[in-house]
């Protein structure tokens, strides 16, 4: 098993921001939104009117905006530590004509104890591997969540060899700009395994959440926050 090599926590370099803002991640972004819908359907649940949907590590706001489109009766908040990413996301919001009451972006650093209205959904995509201490994310969930909050966190998972990293880079980013190729390789080195994430969740009192390997390179954490204080192993309370 390869050892983890952390990478910088914040992507605020102008070249990185421009590259990620210009890249087409529409397929993976849409997958996150569809997974949220599937998890709701599986639990016969729905978001109430004016529910708060929270996207942690939102970057240029791709998934945040998709959440606002999919659930227009909800209030969506994207948080990121990089002010340049937030600026890009908010510029896109204004260009789309979406009011800040429905979609808002703010700069914030983990861990968080509150972000205004408690969240009925907390998602992140490719945030976990940036954190030098993963408990910065997991310790934030309960304070941010409403009494019944759905969570979905999707990230890369660390391969078991350098050869596997080479294969994934060749398969998925061979034609991408050099900055994205560099970052993708670094992110694979910095990501966690399924077993590591399970241990992190146990430490955070979130051991009832589901952790799955997905496709050839992802892992996914999903479930409902409510019930975790009692240690119940449930898909929804």
Predicted feature locations:
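N-terminal, positively charged/glycine-rich alpha-helical extensions of SAM-dependent methyltransferases
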Residues: 1-19
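Conserved class I S-adenosyl-L-methionine
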Residues: 49-59
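Class I SAM-dependent methyltransferase SAM/SAH-binding core
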Residues: 54, 62-110
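A short, conserved alpha-helix within the catalytic core of class I
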Residues: 131-141
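Conserved beta-strand signature within the Rossmann-like core of class I S-adenosyl-L-methionine
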Residues: 148-155
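Conserved alpha-helix/loop element of class I SAM-dependent methyltransferases that forms part
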Residues: 26-49
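A conserved beta-strand element that flanks and buttresses the S-adenosyl-L-methionine
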Residues: 123
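C-terminal alpha-helical "lid/dimerization" subdomain adjacent to the S-adenosyl-L-methionine
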Residues: 156-204, 210-212
């Amino acid at each position: 098993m390869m050892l983890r090599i952390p990478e910088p926590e914040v992507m605020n370099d102008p070249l990185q921001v421009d590259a990620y803002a210009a890249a087409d991640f529409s397929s993976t972004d849409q997958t996150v939104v569809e997974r949220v819908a599937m998890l709701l359907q599986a639990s016969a649940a729905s978001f109430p009117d004016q529910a708060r949907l929270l996207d942690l590590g939102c970057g240029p706001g791709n998934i945040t905006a998709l959440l606002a489109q999919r659930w227009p009766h909800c209030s969506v908040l994207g948080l990121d530590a990089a002010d340049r990413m937030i600026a890009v996301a908010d510029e896109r919001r204004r260009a789309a004509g979406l009011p800040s009451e429905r979609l808002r972006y703010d700069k914030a650093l983990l861990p968080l104890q509150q972000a205004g209205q408690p969240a009925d959904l907390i998602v992140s995509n490719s945030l976990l591997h940036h954190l030098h201490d993963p408990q910065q994310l997991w310790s934030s969930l309960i304070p941010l969540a409403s009494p019944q909050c759905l969570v979905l966190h999707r990230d890369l998972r660390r391969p078991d060899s350098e050869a596997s990293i080479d294969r994934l880079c060749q398969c998925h980013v061979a034609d991408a700009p050099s900055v994205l190729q560099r970052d993708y390789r670094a992110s694979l080195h910095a990501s966690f395994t399924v077993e590591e994430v399970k241990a992190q969740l146990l430490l955070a009192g979130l051991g009832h959440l589901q952790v799955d390997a997905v496709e050839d390179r992802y892992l996914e954490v999903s479930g409902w926050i409510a019930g975790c204080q009692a240690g119940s192993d449930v898909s929804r309370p």
